């Protein structure tokens, strides 16, 4: 789950991480009032959307007086920002962060992520702050420094100091930088983050170490123990199909293709997408109905898949273990009738009650193409979609 920058900064502030003072605004008048309350000569007007690259897209402006705050707020609020992370459709700006200006001396990058190869949290940092870390990793990987953190003891002071020295934090500010990184790590662990990224971390003219931006991403499976984080969720920033899927405990992720996929089990779902690509097709989604799907869940899964106008055909690939193939077959038939399905539909069933499931499909009188294997099903749906 993602949250907005201003929310992330509030979380970090509670862990002793230094961030600029700022206020959120939902209207132009609120933006002007927020700037008045901050009382600084320079304010930064920042679009709040769940995506990076806002500055390059015109979503971050420096205002030197209240009139400029009003002008920038009017120009940003309600507009659609298109960045490298939003896709071509972009995201509408519905809120702003009005923040006090900062006398920046130097920009850095600091981030915490999960390294799945080592099963550890890794602290990454670079002198190349303010630019995309992926770009730095590609062009000058030697400028990225890493510290792998033992989960038994957590981030150690010597590791934070080593990072600070490696990225050339001024000696007199190393203590502040260490405190900053320790606070960031505490927030990462206690709030079950999957990413905590500060880009840029800055040193200022008045001798402070501060987070000018904050990107926090949380493990959705752990939100039950962080109710305060769950309250920060902004549904307007999320895909409506993903929200609908979550109501029925369906794991749905939209993709760019035209072949809808309905599968049980994440591993089988990924294998299904791979084999569709192998036969030169393009999956339109990842959709895992889970191990205990009912006819109702299958029906809702169909509706979610079909809400994507790019879908030209559907491949249902089910291995019945806990889930019975006859239940899936009944769900497929019910869903097909309810939604008035006119697109090509290929179904591959295997496992518990498979013969009964196939019998139900064959006797349904509906235009359902049966597949004998996963490869057979992938070839058939790719051929039907054309």
UniProtKB/Swiss-Prot annotation:
One cellular-component annotation, GO: succinate-CoA ligase complex
Bound cofactor: record note: Binds 1 Mg(2+) ion per subunit.
GO biological-process terms attached to the record: succinyl-CoA metabolic process; tricarboxylic acid cycle
Transmembrane segments: none
Annotated ATP binding sites: 46, 53-55, 99, 102, 107
SUPFAM superfamilies membership: Glutathione synthetase ATP-binding domain-like, Succinyl-CoA synthetase domains
GO molecular function: ATP binding; magnesium ion binding; succinate-CoA ligase (ADP-forming) activity; succinate-CoA ligase (GDP-forming) activity
Pathway: Carbohydrate metabolism; tricarboxylic acid cycle; succinate from succinyl-CoA (ligase route): step 1/1
Binding residues for Mg(2+): 199, 213
Residue numbers binding substrate: 264, 321-323
Coiled-coil annotated residue ranges, if any: none
UniProt KW keywords: ATP-binding, Ligase, Magnesium, Metal-binding, Nucleotide-binding, Tricarboxylic acid cycle
EC number: 6.2.1.5
Cofactors (names): Mg(2+)
Subunit structure: Heterotetramer of two alpha and two beta subunits.
Family annotation (HAMAP family): Succ_CoA_beta (MF_00558)
Protein name: Succinate--CoA ligase [ADP-forming] subunit beta
Organism: Bacillus mycoides (strain KBAB4)
Phylogenetic placement of the source organism: Bacteria, Bacillati, Bacillota, Bacilli, Bacillales
